């Protein structure tokens, strides 16, 4: 028998349907009837027939026709909203598409599994789990470690030993011993009281990352959760039942208590949850619709679910992976700009970078050579100015290896810290099964990821700062020798004038966001937790800075491609022509002014999906594998001893010299 979960004026009602031929209108009337039945005053109505209503699907808010048959219009166990005439949409009803969902592909239930052991999760793995590309299972070794850890907790309960967080209160209440008959209530109260975050909910993708990372940490076997409960958490993840987790409220020690409590709250059947099937709804109904039961917490399990740095680390993981992707592509975008501005490749000579051998600097210089080597990839644009009177380029072109290079090295440093944090036990107290005891410590403190993510924001921001200056050079006719703002009939058309302003605004905003949050601390929990990391804000603002970098480079990419239009029929190198073709597949050239924001977003999407890298990477790697000799073309302004000797041979001797 099909059944539907119907939301009417803040209440959720389970409505069974014996006949799929019944209509949407019948479902609405039956839901209203049940709603009236539960109200002492019949909800203010005298009869069901007088109530006028509309029926929406919760998923996507699609309006349903009252005459449609239920078996055609809805799926079994689907969630719907009945909006009564005169009412607005119920105030506690949350749209089923939170902000940020557009960043990733639509959810499709994955077929592949990733086995978590608590020791080997990578940043790329976690991002893919967030995107819904894998389900989760535990390794057999992880299952055994979890069971052994739980046996220690069971012994503590049996022997009535006083242990923090298991048989005592929390924080300032650490010395308050809890009676044995209230230990389960203690854990539920912990989750409820600590679910005190505010702000917008995490997107489903980010909530998946958060939940997956918490599962990985629990799989290490140092938290004392039971295998039964952990498997219930995994089942919720695999069904994509995701709790409402507000983005604000963590100070980053003792761990990310507020967001992780919201995560646990949904798992125990309270608060809101989201799934692709239901959209947002009460957690108990979302779980039930997927054949799952709310978790019944055992002693220590509430604490095991909420104590750790997983909010900081999961958001930081996304920031890190996106920073890595945009840093690679920034080299390609900058190389394209250098071609348009008729810059020289002399500054990327291997000897220059060999005497200052920072790894990132050397790699960036190599990428520029692989993309701009006109002898290997003939460039008509480069040949058009090979012999010119320009001695050297501006810093924004000449110093790309040094500026972009340190960003790459920063990302590598941060990745090492975040990868360690992904596979670290950050609970308190820690359960050591091999010793048969628990030990209180401070692994929950988020200083490591907080400091690393502050550093990431500072480092990656510089890609946008230097990109904005290159956009200025492209738009300024006195610097580019191109039409002002890269458009014909300037004055009638404004071209990239305000797109450049947008880039400047993003760079300026990021400067404020680069102020480290981890230099701040406030004492909390009655001075028990008297130093905190503020890592949650470090992670969130790192993500915002990375997004700004992507958007600024999207504008530069469009500007550089537009600049090429004014150099035609000359062509650039093969890999850069491929990048140009990629951009033109989604954004046409500007002949005159048009609505520009969608084009910026289209270019942003190319960078976000790493399409620019995918196009250029084969040429970069081929150049690397073939060990192509470096070409060093001479120009009248290039000084060398060899050229000096040649010139000396042509100077006639004179008695006066």
Swiss-Prot record:
Modification note: Contains an active site 4-methylidene-imidazol-5-one (MIO), which is formed autocatalytically by cyclization and dehydration of residues Ala-Ser-Gly.
Primary enzyme class: lyase
Record's keyword annotation contains Transport: no
E.C. numbers: 4.3.1.3
GO cellular component, one term: cytoplasm
CDD domains (UniProt xref): PAL-HAL (cd00332)
Modified residues (Phosphoserine): 635, 648
Variant or mutagenesis effect after changing residue 322 to Q: In His; reduced stability
Modified residues (2,3-didehydroalanine (Ser)): 254
Organism superkingdom: Eukaryota
Pfam families: Lyase_aromatic, Par3_HAL_N_term
Record-listed Phosphothreonine modification sites: 396, 637
Residues in cross-link 5-imidazolinone (Ala-Gly): 253-255
GO biological process, one term: L-histidine catabolic process
GO MF assignments: histidine ammonia-lyase activity
Catalytic activity annotation: L-histidine = trans-urocanate + NH4(+)
Biological pathway: Amino-acid degradation; L-histidine degradation into L-glutamate; N-formimidoyl-L-glutamate from L-histidine: step 1/3
Keyword set, alphabetical order: Disease variant, Histidine metabolism, Lyase, Phosphoprotein
Noted disease: Defects in Hal are the cause of histidinemia (His).
Family of the protein in this entry: Belongs to the PAL/histidase family.
NCBIfam families, per the entry: hutH, PRK09367.1
Stated name of the protein: Histidine ammonia-lyase
Organism encoding this protein: Mus musculus
């Amino acid at each position: 028998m099909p059944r539907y979960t119907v939301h009417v004026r803040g209440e959720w009602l389970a409505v069974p349907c014996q006949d799929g031929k019944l209509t949407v209108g019948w479902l609405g009337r039956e839901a209203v009837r049940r709603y009236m039945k539960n109200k002492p005053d019949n909800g203010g109505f005298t009869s069901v027939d007088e109530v006028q209503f509309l029926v929406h699907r919760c998923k996507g808010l699609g309006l349903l026709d009252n005459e449609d048959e239920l078996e055609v219009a809805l799926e079994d166990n689907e969630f719907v909203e009945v909006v009564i005439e005169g009412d607005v949409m119920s105030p506690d009803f949350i749209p089923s598409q939170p902000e940020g969902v557009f960043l990733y592909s639509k959810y499709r239930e994955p077929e592949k599994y990733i086995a978590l052991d608590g020791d080997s999760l990578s940043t790329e793995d976690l991002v893919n789990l967030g995107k819904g590309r894998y389900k989760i299972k535990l390794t057999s070794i992880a299952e055994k470690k979890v069971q052994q850890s739980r046996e220690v907790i069971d012994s503590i309960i049996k022997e009535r030993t006083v242990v923090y967080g298991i048989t005592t209160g929390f924080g300032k209440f650490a010395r308050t011993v809890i009676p044995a008959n209230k230990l389960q209530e203690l854990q539920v109260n912990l989750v409820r009281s600590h679910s005190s975050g505010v702000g917008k909910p995490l997107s489903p993708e980010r909530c998946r990352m958060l939940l997956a990372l918490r599962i990985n940490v629990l799989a290490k076997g140092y938290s004392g959760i039971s295998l039964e409960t952990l498997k219930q958490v995994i089942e919720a993840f695999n069904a994509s039942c995701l709790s409402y987790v507000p983005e604000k409220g963590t100070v980053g020690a003792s761990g990310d208590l507020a967001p992780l409590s919201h995560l646990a709250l949904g798992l125990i059947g309270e608060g809101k949850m989201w799934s692709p099937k239901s959209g947002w709804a009460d957690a108990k109904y979302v779980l039930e619709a997927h054949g799952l039961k709310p978790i019944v917490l055992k002693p220590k399990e509430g604490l095991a679910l909420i104590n750790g740095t997983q909010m900081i680390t999961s958001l930081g993981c996304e920031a890190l992976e996106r920073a890595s992707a945009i840093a690679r592509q920034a080299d390609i975008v900058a190389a394209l700009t250098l071609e348009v501005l008729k810059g020289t490749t002399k500054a990327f000579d291997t000897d220059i970078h060999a005497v200052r051998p920072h790894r990132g600097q050397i790699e960036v210089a190599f990428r520029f050579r692989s993309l701009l080597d006109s002898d290997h990839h003939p460039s008509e644009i480069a040949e058009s100015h090979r012999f010119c009177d320009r001695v050297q380029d501006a810093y924004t072109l000449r110093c790309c290896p040094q500026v972009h290079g340190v960003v790459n090295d920063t990302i590598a440093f941060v990745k090492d810290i975040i990868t360690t944090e992904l596979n670290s036990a950050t609970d308190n107290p820690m359960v050591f099964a091999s010793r048969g005891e628990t030990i209180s410590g401070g692994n929950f403190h988020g200083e490591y990821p907080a400091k690393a993510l502050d550093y990431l924001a500072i480092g990656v921001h510089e890609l946008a700062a230097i990109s904005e200056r290159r956009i200025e050079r492209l738009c300024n006719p006195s610097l580019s020798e191109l039409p002002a703002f890269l458009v014909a009939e300037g004055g009638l058309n404004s071209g990239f004038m305000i797109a450049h302003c947008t880039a400047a605004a993003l760079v300026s905003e990021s400067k404020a966001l680069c102020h480290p949050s981890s230099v701040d601390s406030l004492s909390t929990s009655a001075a028990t937790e008297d130093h905190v990391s503020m890592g949650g804000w470090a992670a969130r603002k790192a993500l915002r800075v990375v997004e700004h970098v992507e958007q600024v480079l999207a504008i530069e990419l469009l500007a550089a491609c537009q600049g090429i239009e004014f150099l035609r029929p000359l062509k650039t190198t093969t890999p850069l022509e491929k990048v140009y073709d990629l951009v033109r597949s989604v954004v046409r050239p500007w002949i005159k002014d048009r609505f520009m924001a969608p084009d910026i977003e289209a270019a942003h999407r190319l960078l976000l999906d790493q399409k620019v890298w995918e196009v250029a990477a084969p040429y970069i790697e081929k150049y690397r594998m073939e060990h192509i000799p470096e070409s060093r073309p001479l120009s009248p302004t290039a000084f060398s001893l060899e050229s000096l000797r040649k010139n000396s041979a042509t100077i006639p001797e004179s008695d006066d010299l």
